[in-house]
Amino acid sequence: MTDKIRSVQGKVVSDKMDKSFVVAIERKVKHPLYGKFIRRTTKLHVHDENNEAKLGDIVEIKECRPLSKTKSWTLVRVVEKAVVA
């Protein structure tokens, strides 16, 4: 068994919850028959103790123990702040 902690980067798509937000992680998958690359999106609920992340930010998250029914990821750092127009 490996003890490597998974960490990924994604974009914050919702920050309406207290101490939580939703991250969308995009990946490209090749269609098995036609060979075209298709974008697939995974949405993850993330714990944010200090409410640091805002809508549109690029964040790095890591896997942790289950914190609730849907939350098992925590915020590591905000990689890039969203540009406010």
Swiss-Prot record:
InterPro entries, per database record: NA-bd_OB-fold, Ribosomal_uS17, Ribosomal_uS17_bact/chlr, Ribosomal_uS17_CS
Pfam families per the UniProt record, alphabetical: Ribosomal_S17
Enumerate the GO terms in the molecular function aspect: rRNA binding; structural constituent of ribosome
Going by the entry's taxonomy, the superkingdom of the source organism is recorded as Bacteria
Q: Return one Gene Ontology term, BP aspect.
A: translation
Q: Does the keyword Ribosomal protein apply?
A: yes
Annotated PROSITE patterns:
RIBOSOMAL_S17
State the function annotated in the UniProt record.
One of the primary rRNA binding proteins, it binds specifically to the 5'-end of 16S ribosomal RNA.
Q: Which HAMAP family match?
A: Ribosomal_uS17_B
State the family it belongs to. Answer: Belongs to the universal ribosomal protein uS17 family.
**The name this protein goes by in its record:** Small ribosomal subunit protein uS17
Taxonomic lineage of the native organism: Bacteria, Pseudomonadati, Pseudomonadota, Gammaproteobacteria, Pasteurellales
What gene name is listed for this protein?
rpsQ
